[in-house]
Structures are given as C-alpha cells and as structure tokens.
Regions:
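Short coil/turn linking the two alpha-helices of tandem helical-hairpin repeats
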Residues: 69, 96, 101-111, 144, ...
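Short coil turns that delineate tetratricopeptide repeat
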Residues: 52, 86, 133-134, 186
Length: 206
C-alpha cells in the first residue's frame, strides 16, 4: 500500500466523523473513492479557498493533481503542505515523482530547467528516506530511478572526461539504491534488470 493510501484511510474515517468535514471535502472524498480525480480537484480547490493551509485538504489536493497529470500544481501544492508539515513523507514522495515526471517529459527536452527538476526530485526522495528510514523500498526504488534518468540526461551531452565521470557517479548511485533494495526484496527481476542496464551504460562511458 502506498503512502497516500495509508494516510487516506485515516482521513476517510476522520472526515466522516469529525467536525472538519465540509460539503466540498465530503464531495471530494466520494469522487476520489470512485477514481474521479477531476471532480476531486474541483471540490478540493473550493475547500482550499475556504480553509487555506489545511494540511488534510492540501494532501488530498496534491495527490489529485498528481493523478490528473497536473504536475506543476502538484508540486506547488505539496510545497505548501511541506511548509506546514515538514515531516510528511508522502509530500516528498509525490513531489519527487511529479518533478521526475516533468524532467522526463519530452515537452521539456529543450528546457534549461530539466536538470533542476532531476536534482530536486533526488533531494525529495533523499529527504523522504531520512524521515522514513533507509530500508524504505519505495523510496529507494524511486531515487534509484531518478539517479538513472538524470545520468541518462547528462550522458547525452557528456563530451569531456569530467562530464563522463559525473555520469558514471550518478549511475553508481542508482546501482547502490537498487542493490540496497535487493537486500530487502531479493529476486526483484525488474530491479536486477535496471542494475544490468546501469552497468551497461557505465561501460559505454568508459
């Protein structure tokens, strides 16, 4: 079960019994249970306008933006949530995934901001690991993928020895996260395949 699903169960119970429940919030919960995240966003934006900086609303709004593929708004919403609750693991997780999705978007191929999105995603996953512990397989996997994608991005322009060395370092960081994950979840073929891929890329850079 992912971080949002773990936390949302408590919010569902709370919203159905606590004084926090409001019309827009209740409608958003019903929509999310049906997988209708567009309606959820509409209702949560109204709730956010009425009760600014409510952590429960922001958590659900950020997740709904993510599910709708609106990654820019997802990032800004989770940034607001982190300013209120700095140790909210799910906020770093989904903000990191949103940043990585933006960085990997073909539409961003000419954007000078791509590198910033890669490094920011890695920082988010690293912060989440600091909070949740270094045996968090979900975070290790996503940071490993972020290192890999960032290394691929940098390798396209790597001409000089120092640039190639920097790419190798990123691929090695990816391998380290994947190998740590394998000690916790052995025989993950997808992870074994990614390690093989990383090693092949390192060989091509030498």
């Amino acid at each position: 079960m992912n971080y949002f699903k773990k936390s949302i169960l408590g919010l569902i119970v709370f919203s159905s019994t606590g004084s926090f429940a409001q019309n827009n919030y209740d409608k958003s919960m019903a929509a999310m249970m049906k997988g209708d995240y567009k309606t959820a966003v509409t209702q949560l934006e109204k709730a956010d306008a009425k009760t600014r900086d409510d952590a429960k609303v922001l958590k659900m709004l950020g997740y709904s933006y993510f599910q709708n593929g609106d990654f820019e708004k997802c990032i800004s919403t989770y940034t607001r949530l982190i300013s209120l609750t700095p140790n909210e693991v799910s906020a770093y997780y989904y903000r990191g995934k949103a940043r990585l999705n933006v960085a990997n978007d073909p539409k961003e191929s000419l954007s000078d901001m791509r590198e910033n999105f890669y490094t920011s995603a890695i920082k988010d996953f690293t912060k989440a690991i600091e909070i949740s512990g270094d045996e968090d397989t979900q975070m290790l996997q996503n940071r490993g993928l972020a290192y890999k994608d960032y290394a691929i991005f940098k390798s396209y322009k790597a001409k000089k020895g120092a640039e190639r060395t920097a790419c190798v370092t990123l691929f090695n960081n990816s391998i380290a996260d994947f190998q740590k994950l394998l000690t916790l979840q052995p025989l993950r073929k997808d992870i074994i395949d990614w390690i093989t891929y990383d090693k092949a890329q390192i060989a091509s850079l030498k």
